[in-house]
Amino acid sequence: MPWAKEGDLQELLKAFPQASVVELQNSTSVIVPKDILIDVLKYLKEKLGYKLFLDHSVVDLKDLLENEKEFNKVVKQNLIAFPEDRESRFQAFYILYNVDERKRVIVKTRTNGKLPTIEKLWFAGKWAERECYDMFGIEYEGHENLVRAFMWDTYPYFPLRKDFPLEGIPEQELPSLNEVVFGDNLEGLMNYDRMHTRVPTLEDLEVTEKKRLKKKAQIVLNWGPLHPGTHGTMWFLFDLEGERIVQTDVILGQLHRGVEKLAEHEMYNQFLVYTDRMDYLSALCSNQAWVVAIERLMGIHDKVPPKAKYIRTMMSELQRINSHLLWLGTYALDLGALTIFLYAFKEREKIMDIIEGITGARLTISYPRIGGVRMDLPEGALEVIKAFIKKFPEELKDWETILTRNRIWLRRNKEVGIISKEDAYFHGVTGPVIRGSGIPYDIRKFEPYDAYDEVEFDIPVGEIGDCYDRYLVRIEEMKQSIRIIEQCVAKLEKMSKNEPFFYEGEGKKLKLSLDGIGVKAPVGEIYSSGENPRGELGFYVVSTGGTSPYRVKIRPPSYYNLCIYPHLMKDRYVADAVTILASIDPVVGETDR
């Protein structure tokens, strides 16, 4: 596990005697008072090389502070910073990464509702702080524009606080779902209550729009939230001088479903289906990242049978190609290359058929399980996969012939949307976006999971970080995915049909426990991540020993990759808006959660 050790942080401890280091099985934390938080974060970034910002949020300790037994249980495991402080309701955490040394660290502090902003250290932190303000009501001193991230600005509540009910607060009367406009009212089995949670009005949305917009020019162009070029319910406001974009504002939340709130009320295996519905274009990869996180929390990841690990790795790489094919087809279509769209979707349909034949589903799949996979590969599955990976490289080569040296393609992509290495760290981008900037950051190599430490593959990187580099990186990633799948198929062909595909545990009761009453994960915390087609999908999980997590913070790669978009659009033309957005490749189900 790539966690920093206390010995790696001695220089920090000498510079800040008030700080302390806590090493746990699945994390290393630096505990600091709030008044030196910014100084410690700056020291970690500038002196110790922790330049990549991964995530920031808070944990609401209200339920623990009100339950002495539960509180002492987590204090015993060193999960709480400054446990003697019973007044500060929230524990804030910041997750940073040192790419050069491949080490990760968490910085923790306590607060009762106010924190200093980190926006001058990392722009990505600015978006993370908006989310914390939106969900928990945390106020950030010095924040340039502290507005809500997902909810509309007149919404009066903070949904991720422990005292906010899962079903919301019913305060608005709306027609019952049993009532119809025409014909007889339905005599349904359920009599739905007319009182519902608050919904935004047009006036609420106008207030939200005005709070986002910092008008600097004469023309404002609305792009979205329902535009074919955004490929999802994303809303952009462009401030224009002629066709030149002076500044860009992003309004998210149209697809916000409260996934992290739901996680606190579902058992660990039950939450698996919600990971399908975040990045719905790469559900298998999201499933895999979640089950690996919980396996590591439970201490059973090394006990998962090799067959299950190779199956999960193979299926995730098929899903990666699937996702990149959809990206390539729609990207080319947006720029006028209709032929590539047709070719890419023809091959993607073959992968969809393979996935459906193995798992029974095409989009929302939930095939992996904590401890393995739901079922073994059906007979003939490997033969179909071998047939696909034998022909696919030839198809990919033909597309490269059409696109890679095409003069129009070059003009639309070369030196457009350049992301330097410094900007990549500053904005917390990951996946093909950071690799396009020449930084070889790939979780499959840096923190291998499942069978990734058993297979050989390369990490493609770009040179200058423009849209063209990001295109080349994704094309090469599909080739590397084929390499990985070939090795997985070769291993699986040698395995007996009777080899286990699920870790049974003591007394062979784990699977029954997980699918039935739910397994109890031990008291602890973990940050674990997987390499999704869009970047690092991370899960920060706090467990108090129950069948459901106390807190789940999801690090969505699309959310942080998208935060660099306004920077890339400055002084560009409207025609570049689609190109740059498509090169980032966000999925709105993941940004909004």
From Swiss-Prot:
InterPro entries: NADH_Q_OxRdtase_suD, NADH_quin_OxRdtase_su_C/D-like, NADH_UbQ_OxRdtase_30kDa_su, NDH-1_subunit_CD, NDH1_su_D/H, NiFe-Hase_large. It is a peripheral membrane protein. It comes from the Bacteria. Residues 217-593 are annotated as: NADH dehydrogenase I subunit D. GO terms for cellular component: NADH dehydrogenase complex; plasma membrane. Pfam families: Complex1_30kDa, Complex1_49kDa. It is found in: Cell inner membrane. Keywords: Cell inner membrane, Cell membrane, Membrane, Multifunctional enzyme, NAD, Quinone, Translocase, Transport, Ubiquinone. GO terms for molecular function: NAD binding; NADH dehydrogenase (ubiquinone) activity; NADH:ubiquinone reductase (non-electrogenic) activity; quinone binding. In the N-terminal section; belongs to the complex I 30 kDa subunit family. In the C-terminal section; belongs to the complex I 49 kDa subunit family. NCBIfam families: NuoD (TIGR01962), PRK06075.1 (NF004739). NDH-1 is composed of 13 different subunits. Subunits NuoB, CD, E, F, and G constitute the peripheral sector of the complex. This is NADH-quinone oxidoreductase subunit C/D 1. It comes from Aquifex aeolicus (strain VF5). The lineage of its organism: Bacteria, Pseudomonadati, Aquificota, Aquificia, Aquificales. The gene is nuoC1.
